Each structure stands twice: as structure tokens, then as C-alpha cells.
Amino acid sequence: VGSEMCIRDRIDGAQSSLRVHIYEFLSPDVTHALLDALGRGIEVTLVLEEGILDSSSVSNSQRGHASVLDEAGALVYWMVDPSGMSSPFTYIHSKIILRDSDQVWISSGNIKDSSLPPDGESGNREWSVFIDSEEVAAIFSSWLSWDEDHEKRYIREHGSWAYPSLGWELPPMSGTQSTDPTSRETLTNQASITPILCPDNCLIEIIGAIDASVDSLEISAQYLDVDWYWGEGDDSPLLGAIKRAAERGVDVRILLNAFYADDETWSLVDTVNAEWNDDQGLNATARLMSTSDRITKLHNKGMIVDGETVLVGSMNWGSSAMLRNREHGAIITSQSVASQFLASFNEDWDRVDERTDTDGDTLPDMWELIHGLDRDRASVAGTALSEQSLDPDGDGLDNRMEFLLGGEPFNQDTDGDCIRDGDEWEFATQSLRPESAAIASGDVNQNGVDDGLEFGCTVDGDVVPDPNPEENQNQTTDEDE
């Protein structure tokens, strides 16, 4: 999560030029900052995606921001799908700003409130970096110039065709004065930086960094495609490189977005945690990121290798991003830089909430951790049984029902009233109370009599009261004799 102040500060410091290539450009604060820059005589250039995958209102808003800047003197271009031919790129999905000739901002997040939340608001987990280097800036500058050439058929100048609907107005600034909630420390040490560009060299460079891993590999990504939908072959070369690393003994951790988790996501989690880890003995774990009050979902696309190399960029971990989109990123080798991102990764890795379910077994990670179950795997190692179907305490309720009713999976009698959790339903029915209330209360009908005395004790090892005492009052038990 970052603040718009991070970018606004850098925009305010521009001396000659600002070049913004972005998929979604929707931040009023950043637009106002660029308007101020134009007022100071700064040359501002934007390249935006014409066909964003979002609602019509969002597309209209993007056109509004672009039109305001165009009217103020900015050079605004759109990447389009030209008629009569295919564009070389499906989308411009970049998140990059080049300031003057010596500084680059690269991010996983768009310029919008969900990626750059105003002060006090929640947003996505994103990774961003400012790089102060004339050499690196020159490389990115040459790449940006290629996509700023409106003579190319897939680049179109802003015009009336891209105006917003009548009545659209630029929202006011948020007034936030926040700072980046993670470190804003400037790291002045030397770093090795490899600029990457999709579809040109990004896949080769990312796989190369994974193949060079020796000790550890952390991946923080919105998603990781198992199937390779574009290009040659059906299997993801990224996933193949990750598995090769695990087979070399590298400690692999994969953190994925839980917000849009689907069957493919849980299939990948099961592949890594069950097949790679349990069956093949590889030290690899996949997990879904839990949320917090400040972080709503994982929108990142990053990687850390051996605690000293970090990938920051706009490219998702799938074939479309790597082979069909225009994307920008950087692989930075510096232990002090990587440590900042590793601290963020570990925070996300360890956090739990009440909803996230990594293994898809319908038991939230937090509940499984509290009760000593496995948050990362749905099936029981060496069996075909699912963890949710087990009844470890033998009280007649499987783990799924224990969770739903508020019971404890390793305690036959959660409320200590001498009635097994699995028998509470009968007493709850008699008392006209929900079963969940009976499991949690020793006096569910609030009559001052302990439920175990009123209904009869059913916990294993105790004598169950005779339902027909008058018929059997003259009989003796083994204990009497």
C-alpha cells in the first residue's frame, strides 16, 4: 500500500519533463499535480490504454482525466487496437513514470485510489520503487519513445473521440498529507539494475533470476497461471522454473491474491502444498494473502530471490502479460533494497483474517491456526480424506460443523456442560434454541440448571442417565455388585 503523496512529491520536483505510461489513470490528486507541473512549464506526456477492462463509468473517468490534461497542454496518446490490423500489444499494462532524464517510478499498481489510497483509506498491496539513475532512465526513455510515436497505427492522439460524457468534472484533491506507510528511506548504496520490457525480454529475465536462486524464493502475485494460454506449450515456463528451484533445495514461498481466488488458484495451492511439498518432499508452500484494516487485496507482481534480488513491475504472472502486453519492470540486486520488500512479504505471509481460506477446505486459515489444523492443505497427507470431514475428538461433529457451530475440534464438550457437542442439537431442539447456542452455553435455556444435569451427561467415559428409571429401578449394575 502506498500513498499518492509519494508520487506527488516526485512530480512536484520535476525540472523539465514527466512521461506517464499507465493502464488506468484515475487519481484526482495526481492529475492536479500534473496540472500544476504544466503550469510551471513542465512538458507532460501520457500514454494510456483505450480498452481497459472495467466499467463504462471508469472508462469515462479515464477519458475525463486525459481530456483535462490535454486541454492544459499535455501530450496525450492512447494505445488502441487499430482497424484493419492487429496491434502488437493486447494492452498497455505499464505502471511507469519517467521524471526528467534521471528518475524512474515503477509499480505494480495503477494510478488510482485502490493502489494509491488517500490518507486513512485502505487499498491494495502493491510494490513500487523510485530509481535515481541516468543510465537506467535512458534505457526506459528509449522504450517509452517507441510507444509515444503516434505515427504507429496502434498509437492514437487524444481528440474528440476520447472525450468524456457531457458534464464530467475533475474531482477536487483529497487533501491528504500522508506519507508512505512502509519505509520512505532513500537507499543510496549501489545496486545492479536490469530494466525489463514485455513482451521483449521480461520472460527470459524473470526465468533467469529464478534459475539463479540458491537459498530462497518468494513470489507475491495477484495470480500465477498454471496453464500457458499463449505461445508454445501448455505449461507455464514460470511455474516450471519455480519447481526447478524447489528441486535444487531452494525454499519457495508463493503468496497469491485471495480476493479473486477460484478453482485454478486452489488447484495451484494444492499442487504446491500436497504434490510438491508432501508427496515429493520439496520445501515449497503456497498461500493466499489475508487482509487487514489497511490492505484489501494483493495486486502485486513481485519476487525476491535469495534475500538480495527483487522484481518490481507491472507484469502479472501469466502468458498474456509476458507475451502480449506492453509491460515495464526492473530486477534490482541489492540486499538493503530487497530487505525492505522482504519485510513487507513476511508481514503479508504471516497475517490471518477471519475469511481467507488458503486450501479451499471451507475452514478459514485463522480458525485452523487457532485449533492446530493445517491452513495450507485441504487433504490429510497419505489419505484421500479432507481435513474438514474429520472428527478428531469423536463428538459426532466433523471439523466443518465444529467451525459452523462454534465448537472446538479437539474438545468433545466445548462448553463443559457434560453434553457431547454432537448431542447438543437434541437438547437445543427441546429448548427451542439454535444448536450453536447450545454448544457454547452450559445453560442454554437460562433456567439456572446446568444443561448436563437437565439433559443427561453424554461425554465419553461418563454414565448416561437411564431414560426409563422406573422400569429398571430394581436392576443392579456391575458397579453395584
Label every PLM stretch briefly.
Residues 142-148, 331-356, 434-438, 451-453, ...:
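A recurrent domain-boundary module in secreted/ectodomain proteins
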Residues 57-58, 229-233:
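Short, solvent-exposed loop/turn segments at secondary-structure boundaries
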